[in-house]
Amino acid sequence: MFDILMYLFENYVHSEVEFLVDEDELTKELTRAGFHQAEIIKALTWLEGLAELQEAGTPYLCNHDQQSFRIYTKDELERIDVESRGFLLFLEQIKVLSVETREMVIDRVMQLDESSLNLDDLKWVILMVLFNAPGHESAYEQMEDLIFEQPDGRLHS
């Protein structure tokens, strides 16, 4: 499923090619690209879930304290390794992620069918979330810079 999300992001969203909005056409395109039907459905469902997070009624996106500290659940700790959690914290500290977008990222990570996620995969999920979050264009651009113009060495300590 993650491969399909990457394919869609790289070939449509990131390349600024007109995105196919017809789900049947998109499914046919992905099938021609070699993806399996079941994985295509999972990826499209994941994207629909991302779009639904934009709705104002999402409970964990309301009434938050900007000074709060995130405690991860057992399942989140198993899926998101220490390095990735540190990177999320780093992005919050430099204001690339807000409390809301961090929670959206964690929500989308937990909905992937991967048992664990590496830092590079997490970065792509963050890009997808920021791209789809209205009003976060600057954060998206900063994240792009962190990914594509990454200096040698670690980004955070």
UniProtKB/Swiss-Prot annotation:
InterPro entries: Smg. It holds the Pfam family DUF494. Belongs to the Smg family. This is Protein Smg homolog. It comes from Shewanella piezotolerans (strain WP3 / JCM 13877).
